[in-house]
C-alpha cells in the first residue's frame, strides 16, 4: 500500500513536470523577444544583457504558470520550493542560452557531439551558415537539455514542498 505522502509527491511531481515541460516552449520561444533571441548568444555585455532579459521573462512565465496550475488544483506550493525549482531552471537556462559554454560542453570528450553540431546546420541567407537557430543540432540539444533540467527542477520542487509538510 502506498503512503499518502508518496501519492501527494507523485501527483505534485506530475503536475510540476507537465507545467515545466509544456510551458517551456511558450516561454522560451513566444515570450522571448526577437531581439533577445538574436542577440543572447553574442559575446560580452551585449549578449549577457539580452540573455538575462530572456531568462527573466522565461522565469516569470514559468513561475506564474506553476503557481496558477498548483493553485487551480488546490495545492499551496511553498514559496521556498517554487523558488528553488525556478532558480534551477533560470540559472541553467542562462548558461545554456549564452551558447559558448553549452557548445564547449557538447563538444567535450564527455558528450562528444561536435560532429553533430557541425553537421546539422542551416543556411538562411546565401553564404551564411547558422549553427544555432531553428533546425540545427544546437537548437535540438538546447531544447532537450532544458527539458531534462526541468525534470530535476520538478523533482527538487516536489521534494522541498513535501518535506515542508512533514
Give the residues covered by each predicted segment.
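Short amphipathic, positively biased membrane-proximal segments
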Residues: 1-166
Amino acid at each position: 500500500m502506498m503512503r499518502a505522502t508518496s501519492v501527494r509527491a507523485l501527483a505534485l511531481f506530475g503536475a510540476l513536470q507537465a507545467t515545466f515541460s509544456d510551458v517551456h516552449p511558450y516561454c522560451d520561444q513566444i515570450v522571448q523577444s526577437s531581439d533577445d533571441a538574436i542577440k543572447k548568444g553574442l559575446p560580452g555585455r551585449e549578449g549577457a544583457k539580452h540573455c538575462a532579459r530572456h531568462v527573466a521573462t522565461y522565469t516569470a512565465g514559468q513561475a506564474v504558470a506553476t503557481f496558477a496550475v498548483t493553485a487551480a488544483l488546490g495545492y499551496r506550493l511553498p514559496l521556498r520550493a517554487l523558488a528553488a525549482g525556478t532558480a534551477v531552471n533560470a540559472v541553467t537556462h542562462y548558461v545554456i542560452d549564452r551558447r559558448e559554454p553549452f557548445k564547449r560542453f557538447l563538444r567535450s570528450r564527455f558528450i562528444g557531439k561536435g560532429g553533430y553540431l557541425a553537421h546539422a546546420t542551416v543556411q538562411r541567407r546565401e553564404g551564411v551558415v547558422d549553427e544555432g537557430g531553428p533546425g540545427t543540432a544546437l537548437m535540438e540539444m538546447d531544447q532537450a537539455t532544458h527539458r531534462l533540467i526541468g525534470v530535476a527542477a520538478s523533482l527538487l520542487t516536489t521534494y522541498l514542498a513535501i518535506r515542508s509538510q512533514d
